[in-house]
Amino acid sequence: MEGINISYFMNGAAFMFFGYVSFRLLTHRPRSRIQRILGLTLAFWALLEFKDILLYFPSLKTERLVNSLLFIDGWAVAACSFYLLELTAPGWLNWKKVFSLVSPYLAFTIAYLCTFYTPIFPFYFGFILIYSAIIVLIVTFAARRYQRYIRNNYSYSEHIDVAWLKKATFILAICLVTWVYTLSLIHISEP
């Protein structure tokens, strides 16, 4: 089996997984606020996977379109941060905060779409790394604060643990750094 066919399959499987889970989370009643945010985050990831599937068609794969869609890919970092922030500080997230967190991504995207100026990519990738580092720090400290709260307020706290959140955030950070590094190599090697 050719490597490219595995890529098709993986994109399709990821699209179906994210789409199905987001549908289940968003249609399940009663649903909590965290389920709704996770459902919306996964719906966004399903759209990203669908976009990647469309890019397998050669007629759609132009340099400007691919570069434009890379900016939308960066929005996934913000989408994941919404879920992590809501998980560690329930009720903190509202539409005003969502807009303020998304606005830099929106500004970079609009700036690129108006100019198609490719040297903006290193600044965008740098912003994503800084934003992610700040989110990782916030989530790490919030998880510690939550752990302390559980220990101080509950007598049986053995199965109430958010240590997994720190590990998951660390793994996400590694994936993000790898993604940004790979994209920066692609854009640095272009003439």
What name fits each language-model region?
Residues 1-110, 114, 123-126:
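N-terminal low-complexity or simple alpha-helical regulatory segments
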